[in-house]
Amino acid sequence: MSSRNNPARVAIVMGSKSDWATMQFAAEIFEILNVPHHVEVVSAHRTPDKLFSFAESAEENGYQVIIAGAGGAAHLPGMIAAKTLVPVLGVPVQSAALSGVDSLYSIVQMPRGIPVGTLAIGKAGAANAALLAAQILATHDKELHQRLNDWRKAQTDEVLENPDPRGAA
């Protein structure tokens, strides 16, 4: 997370508590990479005033990237992007009704002038959003750049050391 001495550089927000089952994968990546982050439920539909306040104060609060996850109508990422210049990465949360395709379409089809970087549906999208946010931050942070490089190497080494899909022999 973050502390007074190490303020959050990234915010992870989601439309409801149930979205945490997906968005926790972004937080896990930040914990591994030691990226200070803030986590909060900000509903586009249930708490619109909170959404506006959050987005309008994002830059002032020191956020350099916002990851917004939402399911269903999934207006959260786009509405945040409309109210801030901080880059927004949208994560479509998989829903029971349409398997997250509805969320994907809501996030990816933004009008010209209000960009949202859209990731994959579900857990992979949440993890990749965190990795992409870390890569953005690493353009001006050599230590984070090295941690990302080490993480990628460990990922590669794990595959090379365990090539048998059946597990240990």
Swiss-Prot record:
Record GO cellular component, one term: cytosol
EC code: 5.4.99.18
Catalyzed reaction equations: 5-carboxyamino-1-(5-phospho-D-ribosyl)imidazole + H(+) = 5-amino-1-(5-phospho-D-ribosyl)imidazole-4-carboxylate
UniProt keyword Nucleus, yes or no: no
GO MF annotations, alphabetized: 5-(carboxyamino)imidazole ribonucleotide mutase activity; identical protein binding
Keywords: Isomerase, Purine biosynthesis
Residues given in the record as substrate binding sites: S16, D19, R46
InterPro entries named in the record: PurE_ClassI (IPR033747), PurE_dom (IPR000031), PurE_prokaryotes (IPR024694)
GO biological process: 'de novo' IMP biosynthetic process
PANTHER family listed in its UniProt record: PHOSPHORIBOSYLAMINOIMIDAZOLE CARBOXYLASE, PHOSPHORIBOSYLAMINOIMIDAZOLE CARBOXYLASE CATALYTIC SUBUNIT
Function: Catalyzes the conversion of N5-carboxyaminoimidazole ribonucleotide (N5-CAIR) to 4-carboxy-5-aminoimidazole ribonucleotide (CAIR).
Protein name from the UniProt record: N5-carboxyaminoimidazole ribonucleotide mutase
Organism: Escherichia coli (strain K12)
